[in-house]
């Protein structure tokens, strides 16, 4: 058999990936299968060449789909540009740049005639999606004229390599296919092929290909997160929209193109199978239009049927995996709240061949596994073959059901408008519990039908017609505006009052914000303002709770500390719709005093101003008691800035854009002051990247805190007090530490040092009890501040803080975490009491919403520890799911601990989780400044 030597080195990859600029019509070459000695043997090509358009095998160094080969984004991008030149079925458009500055490309594929009329079809999609002002007759006319718009993405999770490698084949086949199905489907659809993580593909592919010997290639030991800040959590950002890539995708989905189907491709499939395809397991979110769920199930079933008809076994659905439609915020789930079908597939495979495992029960056909697959060797090309079939199934469904898909988008949007214009009631698990309690033991499970009116359909239980945000009652107005901007970035209509108005006897000023539920994206509006009520899911009565796929409660208005009025009756207001992203009302300098400036502590943006002042060598103070300034009362922690030419310039330049007021006063406010000092923050990370650390890195950058990333080796060897004032250990930053009452994390696998480039070897290592903990304790005793969050609170205990975990069993001195049957609280929003006179809580309200996720709370056991945030009720649940929430009562969620001359701040509540809870950011930010300011106290 003929042997072909593979190209070696990244330089060869880049050269080969960009040198081809003209179409080739070459004889069909073999798809390379690489042997252990680095040579390849011929096999049938995945995609044969067609004259006029360059085939993948003729462009890339090796055909994508070859064992032990990955194309990177540079090559992928170059190939898209070439296809754009060669085919009249494709139009290539940039839809933004990534966090690392790469261009995100979207290949729009359809017939030449459709591509010539994209603006018309885009307008049809928009009008049907938004529904407002479109009658049913007009909707049917538009649906008859329009084209189904389908989004198919690749590469969101960069180590899930099948999707990008397969997408080049999908594109080529669609651009060159002359078969009846291709021509029919392209005529009836507009296909949007987007790459959603270019930075990650470049990192992962280059890392994988860096070794010459194919069998040594791996991407399991990549050195950092494959999205600059969020890693795998780039698929948890869709409602918050913090990252550039998320904003780019959301703009296409909800503000420009409004696809009716969003197909988000992932890995990996269930063990002993090939691919997960919907239908999903329950629960589905109660805010969703039922039609979006039935259509998602319908399309998923069509995908299974296509695979089965082609003899491709191993597709599973429903309970074969944990995926559900409960959680908003993912690329495929946020579409549900916008009346679009969201398809997730999770397929096995990668450039390194693998084996399908033999799982005995998966050899028996059933409704959620219609065609089992036997154990066998599996190659990347096999996954790409399945990907082509699944893509074809989605496209064919959209084409065959074009008018229905388009019209149903309007129907669901109009449902939202109509439901938001009348009295409606949503049934949740809590309502079912109330019906059961009111009905007693009903015959065959039924209760008195009259209870529907007396228990459920009461006036006070009606769903909201809208929400009003009064700018004058916000503790942190810029954060509230940021919340509104997340809605706008998700296509929600937000209105701004042009003049004062009154609703239900309450007077609202001009500039108030109104979000009505009578709009197409009503499900998303409700999901962001209203509490999630997750069912109590168990396999059997009294059994352990079943873990949700992601968090159970996440109401964003609660997390961001937004004060809003929930209006249950129809109302009108003199408003105009916001046409783009809002800016917070400009802050002002109030008063004419010359001694200095007083700024409230309530707005997170005050930390940006503080950090700018500190960077300029100016040292503000926090005043320990409330302050009166120009007729306003500012709470404890108000910021005092003595006047100077430099300070005045910084304050006056900053307050306007930051949306915070500064009071110019004639004398320093009375009361004790805490002088702040410049801080040097060390943010602890690990080789491979810790997602919570990445999110925190993004957060620190937004609020202009100076910081460095520090790794375990440096913690073990450097003079920590000479380099840092604060060390931050986010959740999972120290997974090898153990402490009674916590579930063990365990070590993450790390590569051998000699296999890692020199500049990255310092990233290796672990935080250990034997070496690292004593050095961190010494750092704190000498005046350093240690911040621990989530599971990293094990470190706080090991440092000797006089606190103990509260959510534990203690049997004969043996302390263990509570079993899930005794306490279970997957990511949810809880209400907590705050000690606002503690500097750690300056700027906080006395009662606050905090995010908590199956973590640990504390009991203070000795002097030197102060409780700052407490769960003070039998059931603090605000949004989500809590099993035995009474276990939390009177336990501490945040504690302030003295340790020698330094501080330890332990956060059981996840006060920064995924950069969402703006309402608790200041608990974290305060710690970064308060600890160093109090260091060396008597």
Question: Model-derived features: where do they sit?
Answer:
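Bacterial N-terminal signal peptides that target proteins for export
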Residues: 2-14
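Intrinsic disorder/low-complexity detector
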Residues: 11, 22-25, 394
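C-terminal segment of classical bacterial N-terminal signal peptides
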Residues: 17-29
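Feature marks short, surface-exposed loop/turn motifs that line or immediately flank catalytic pockets
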Residues: 199-200, 269-271, 351, 735
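Divalent-metal coordination cores built from histidine and acidic residues
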Residues: 189-236
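Intrinsic-disorder/low-complexity accessory segments
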Residues: 33-189, 230, 236-237, 242-244, ...
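Short, solvent-exposed turn/loop segments enriched in Gly/Ser/Thr/Pro and often Arg
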Residues: 193-197, 208, 264-272, 792
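Hydrophobic, helix-prone linear segments
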Residues: 271, 328-329
